[in-house]
Amino acid sequence: MSTTAAASDSPETFDIVVIGGGAAGIGVTASLLRRRPGLRIAIVEPAERHFYQPAWTLVGGGAFNIGDTVRPMSSVMPERAHWIRASANAIDPEQHLVRLDNGRALAYQRLIVCPGLRLAWEKIEGLEETLGKNGVTSNYRFDLAPYTWQLVRELKGGKALFTQPGMPIKCAGAPQKALYLSCDYWRKQHVLDKVEVEFNLAGDVLFGVAAFVPSLMKYVERYQASLAFGSNLISVDGARKIATFAVKDAAGGVVRVEKPFDMLHVVPPQLPPPVVSNSVLADKAGWCEVDHATLMHPRYPEVFALGDACSAPNAKTAAAVRKQIVVVAENLLASIDAKPLPALYDGYGACPLTVERGKVVLAEFGYGGKLLPTFPLDPTVPRALAWHLKSGFLPWLYWNGLLKGREWLAAPAKAPA
């Protein structure tokens, strides 16, 4: 691995430029280099640390060590990749250039867009000032997940609010996972009957794949949690411990409703990063436009995208990335070789719903909510096996498989010959 940080007048040229050093960027680079070690690939990533984000929900429930979710970026960067320690500011697909925040430009033959998404904390008035204090927390941040667990342990009664913004978000099940693990702890500590639990969802369904809703509702009822649909968090007054929601009323209008809290778990609105939304690569919603099956850009065939920033309507999860990596690697190399694209993405994503400590509903599904279970078991049933996968095997698979280009259980569908 080489690293570059200095500015230069003329663009440095690479076979492939990858924007983003998250799961998608590191994983697809590793897979490409396993296939063709001679490729000259640059990864544009300013961060010095790499996080295993799927475990932060477990951290917030006291079931995982926060220190085991982070490693130095240098330790996960593929050896033969060129690490560009900078941020991508602009993409010029006409000129095949990526412009960086340090004044440099990188030229590419192929571009992979995977910078993730942006957590828009600022969209909720007063939130940024009170995060990490006054009982306000979020498992969507490395430094706050341990605070979630602290609040859960300390709460002996009162009101606990959990929120979920409008879609799309990273792991649509994560907001309710925080609720379930908190309630499970309170139940075991015999204080759940003293805690008023409310789940405020901007949307109108508990989970987007209907087959899993009955199983989840059993836990909502077990924990005596109330559901407030059409209720979107818009401001937080941490000092007064008041959360304000924009709530849809029966007439279709929107009213402001103030709710007091003792604990507030917030999931922020999530948006495409400006480097994508401000580019000609973006669709109308701001995500990097792709063909949903091939993950190639429909107007710029030198460009591929995967992960949270791409427009494919799949669940934005690491499990989706694991499958997308293989599709992009195979199709990008085929495009270099001027061959038909061989791999098709079926929209696979997975959301291990931690309904209680020790049991998980392993929701695996593709486009249109089609169930795509890995195991020949009823996927809607909570299982201890799925908990062990979530808390033990999947973290190991992430660090030792996905980030290393090892494509276990990730073979894509093939395009018709």
Q: Which role fits each region the language model picked out?
A:
Residues 2-82, 166-210, 416-417:
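Beta1-alpha1 glycine-rich phosphate/pyrophosphate-binding loop at the start
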Residues 128-156, 260-323, 333:
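FAD-site-proximal beta/loop scaffold in flavoenzymes
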Residues 184, 321-347, 353:
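Internal hydrophobic alpha-helix adjacent to the cofactor/substrate pocket in enzyme cavities
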